[in-house]
Structure formats: structure tokens, C-alpha cells
UniProtKB/Swiss-Prot annotation:
GO terms for molecular function: hyalurononglucosaminidase activity. Belongs to the glycosyl hydrolase 56 family. Snake venom endo-hyaluronidase that degrades hyaluronan to smaller oligosaccharide fragments. In venom, it is not toxic by itself, but increases the diffusion of other venom proteins by degrading the extracellular matrix. In addition, it displays antiedematogenic activity. Gene3D superfamilies: Aldolase class I. It is an enzyme of class 3 (hydrolase). InterPro entries: Aldolase_TIM, Glycoside_hydrolase_SF, Hyaluronidase. This is Hyaluronidase-1. One of its GO terms (biological process) is carbohydrate metabolic process.
Length: 449
């Protein structure tokens, strides 16, 4: 009964947010007057330091760490071997730290995690994205299918070894109970520790929430992109995780089979829609900021996204009201000077220009529609309205000389442009502001700083 009530409440909040007059308030953006941010989370330090190739990230409005490193003050990602003693089996079949969470000391894990956080993020005033990437197992028993079924089997054997007197049915039930209890403790306590140590960071788990809408390979033209109801229900049951998160990090990685297809947009749209639904149910005071993880190249390839798929990923993420998008990449991006040059060429071409287009359009809409006190969100989440610069009114110009490169957007908003924005977008006000256009200051809604 409890889960039914939670699901009803989440659906009601979501409908009110996207299709009604009231929109749940948002946390103020990480940087003032920057409603939509683009982050770089790829290990491309070698491009700059070894090959002397500057990817021009800042030129194109991309937030990155010093020397374009994988982790730093802007965004830090913790892989399994970077944070505490995370029990798991890796892709090669190697065992780590007891394999299952109920077979490892939580105290030992938290003590090690504290040391790791101090080492990796020495700045106590850290204000960036803190992303924990634990993908080996899921905290819900029923979601450990396929290769993850090993965690269920190990848990059953663990319970059997401790309680040989129990029947197999009781052992299975005990194994599920103990596994989910330990998994919850590991994930929740790790998150709370990170937030206690670096309270100004945006903390959450990569790929949470997930939508499990991966059936585009088998459905073809019948693919809808919608998240299965059972998966949405399971996400509802993770309310404990959403309540303790300060940001959500779903992914919208595109495989090459989706290139420039309708299915690509369906896939991304419904993953974002589910993330926005969860963001609205996590807290009572504001919707959690959503930062979608994307790749500038198709997954498992070094082929850049088409212009259409840049719209599908970056454009869709901005239009749905996310706080930003994070471009993740592999070591391949900086493996050779040619790789670095390929990334740079893409950055100086379609990728960089489109990022400038969307980030600038989001700022303009925030200014003219929401008085810089909120971000623009589609009035109807399933529409095809995007936050793009109007080509008849604006031009993106790149200037470069021997010492610097800069991008300038020239133009002004025309009346018909403003009408379009008002017809297709509404304001999601930041905390402390309310009204149709975020024009009313509300002291009682201001968060404590």
C-alpha cells in the first residue's frame, strides 16, 4: 500500500510540474545565470600536456577540470577502486572485498572512504559534481539479472553457510533481505559521508535513475522508448536513495545502431522524463538537479554524433529542464596526437558550436522569460520544442589569433522569437522565487546558505 501511495504522489507531482500551472522549484544553478551547464568528464590531460593539443573546452562554454583531467574541482568521478572497499566482482572475474556487501565491514569501508575523499577532493569547499560509479551490482535484489545474478547466488550461499538448518525457501528469503539491507547501507552511508565531508558538492550515483528501455534492438519500428512500468515502480522503491542524493546522473549514451533515428530521440526522451519524475519526488522543497551523462561519440566507437543526435542528446536534455549534461569519454580520446586532433576538430566544428547554441539559448530564455530567476522548461514535455538560437536573429562567430580563440554570439531576440518561447516554454523558478515568470521574491522559500 505504501508503494502505491508513493507512485500516485510521484505521478501527481510530475503532472503538476510539466502540464499544470505550478512547477516545482529548482535549486539555484551551480554558476550564477547559467541555467544549463555542459561538463567535460574525459581523461584528456595528455592532449594538453603531452601532445600540446588544446581542445578549446572553455572557448565553447564547457566546464572542465584543470588540464582537462578526469577528476577535479568541476567534476570528480569515483570508480569502484577509488572509494572505500566496494565489494564486487570485476569484468575479468576477479573478487574484491568479500564480493557481496553483507560480507564486508561497512565501518572499514567508510573509514577508507573518508581517507579517499580527503585525498581525491582535498578542497573542503568543493562545489562540483561528485559522481559515484558503482555498476557491478544493484541495491535491489530483483534488478540483479544477467551477469549480476552472481550476487544473488553468492548471497544465497552466504546465508546457507550461516544457517544450514533453514529450508531452501527460508534461505532465499533471508539472503534477499540481508543483501538488500547491506546494499542499502553501503550506498546510503557512502553518500551521506561524502555530503557531510563536502557539503557544497552535487552528490549522486551514476546511472541512477535508470529506465531499462534498451529494447530498441529487438523492437525496431515498434519501439516506444517508454520505461517499463515495473522499472518505474522499482525506482519508486528507491526513495531512500533519492532523498539522500543532491543530484541525479542518468545516462543518455547512444549506440551506433540508433544513429540519426527516431528511436534515438525516444530512448533519450523517456530516460530524461523518468529522471525528471524522480527529481520531483525526492524532496519537498525543490526538484533535484539532473545532470545527464552523454558521450560525444557513439558508445564503443570513435565516431562523432551526427548533428541530429547532438540535438537528441544535448538539445533534449536542455529542453526537458535538466541542470546540465556531462560528456564522458575514454582513454582513447587522448591515446595519440591524432586522437586528440580528432576530438579538437569535432569540438571546433559541430559539437562546440551546438553547445554554444544551446547554452546561450538557455540563458536568453531564462533572462527574457524568467528574469534570470529560473530556467526554461518545455510546457509539454513530449513536444518537439527546443532551446535553440533563432537562426534568422543570431549568429555564432569564432575569432582566433596566435594567442587566443573566442566565440561571440551576435544578434537580438525579435518579437516572434519571444512569442515562440512563451508558447512553448515555462519557467521553473529557483528557490526564493515564484510566479509565472519568477517575478515574485519569496523569502520563506530561500534555502539556508
Amino acid at each position: 500500500m505504501y508503494h502505491i501511495w508513493i507512485k500516485f504522489l510521484a505521478a501527481w507531482i510530475f503532472l503538476k510540474r510539466f502540464n499544470g500551472v505550478h512547477v516545482m522549484q529548482a535549486k539555484a544553478p551551480m554558476y550564477r545565470n547559467e541555467p544549463f551547464l555542459v561538463f567535460w568528464n574525459a581523461p584528456t590531460t595528455q592532449c594538453r600536456l603531452r601532445y600540446k593539443v588544446d581542445l578549446d573546452l572553455k572557448t565553447f562554454h564547457i566546464v572542465s577540470n584543470a588540464n582537462d583531467s578526469l577528476s577535479g574541482s568541476a567534476v570528480t568521478i569515483f570508480y569502484p577502486n577509488h572509494l572505500g572497499v566496494y565489494p564486487h566482482i570485476d569484468d575479468r572475474g576477479h573478487f574484491f572485498h568479500g564480493i557481496i556487501p553483507q560480507n564486508e565491514s561497512l565501518t572499514k569501508h567508510l573509514n577508507k572512504s573518508k581517507s579517499d575523499i580527503n585525498r581525491i577532493i582535498p578542497l573542503k569547499a568543493f562545489h562540483g559534481l561528485g559522481v559515484i560509479d558503482w555498476e557491478n551490482w544493484r541495491p535491489q535484489w530483483d534488478r540483479n539479472w544477467g551477469s549480476k545474478n552472481v550476487y544473488r547466488n553468492r548471497s544465497i550461499q552466504f546465508a546457507r553457510d550461516l544457517h544450514p538448518e533453514l529450508s531452501e525457501d527460508k534461505i532465499r528469503r533471508l539472503a534477499k533481505k540481508e543483501y538488500e539491507k547491506a546494499a542499502k547501507s553501503f550506498m546510503r552511508d557512502t553518500l551521506l559521508l561524502a555530503e557531510e565531508m563536502r557539503p557544497d558538492g552535487y552528490w549522486g550515483y551514476y546511472l541512477y535513475p535508470d529506465c531499462q528501455n534498451y529494447d530498441y534492438k529487438t523492437k525496431g519500428d515498434q519501439y516506444t522508448g517508454k520505461c517499463p512500468e515495473i522499472e518505474m515502480s522499482r525506482n519508486d522503491q528507491l526513495l531512500w536513495l533519492w532523498r539522500d542524493s543532491t543530484a541525479l546522473f542518468p545516462n543518455v549514451y547512444l549506440e551506433i545502431i540508433l544513429r540519426s533515428s527516431d528511436n534515438a530521440l525516444k530512448f533519450v526522451h523517456h530516460r530524461l522524463k523518468e529522471a525528471m519524475r524522480i527529481a520531483s519526488m525526492a524532496r519537498e522543497d525543490y526538484a533535484l538537479p539532473v545532470f545527464a551523462y552523454a558521450r560525444p561519440f557513439y558508445a564503443y566507437t570513435f565516431e562523432p554524433l551526427t548533428q541530429e543526435d547532438l540535438v537528441t542528446t544535448v538539445g533534449e536534455t536542455a529542453a526537458m529542464g535538466a541542470a546540465g549534461i556531462v560528456f564522458w569519454g575514454s582513454m582513447q580520446y587522448a591515446s595519440t596526437v591524432d586522437s586528440c586532433q580528432k576530438v579538437k576538430k569535432y569540438m571546433n566544428g559541430p559539437l562546440g558550436r551546438y553547445i554554444v547554441n544551446v547554452t546561450t539559448a538557455a540563458k536568453i530564455c531564462s533572462r527574457v522569460l524568467c528574469r534570470k530567476n529560473g530556467r526554461c522548461v518545455r510546457k509539454h514535455s513530449d513536444s518537439n520544442a527546443f532551446l535553440h538560437l533563432f537562426p534568422e536573429s543570431f549568429r555564432i562567430m569564432v575569432y582566433a589569433n596566435a594567442t587566443e580563440k573566442k566565440v561571440i554570439v551576435k544578434g537580438k531576440l525579435e518579437l516572434e522569437n519571444l512569442i515562440y518561447l512563451r508558447e512553448n516554454f515555462m519557467c521553473q523558478c529557483y528557490q526564493g522565487w515564484k510566479g509565472l515568470y519568477c517575478e515574485e521574491y519569496s523569502i520563506k522559500d530561500i534555502r539556508k546558505i
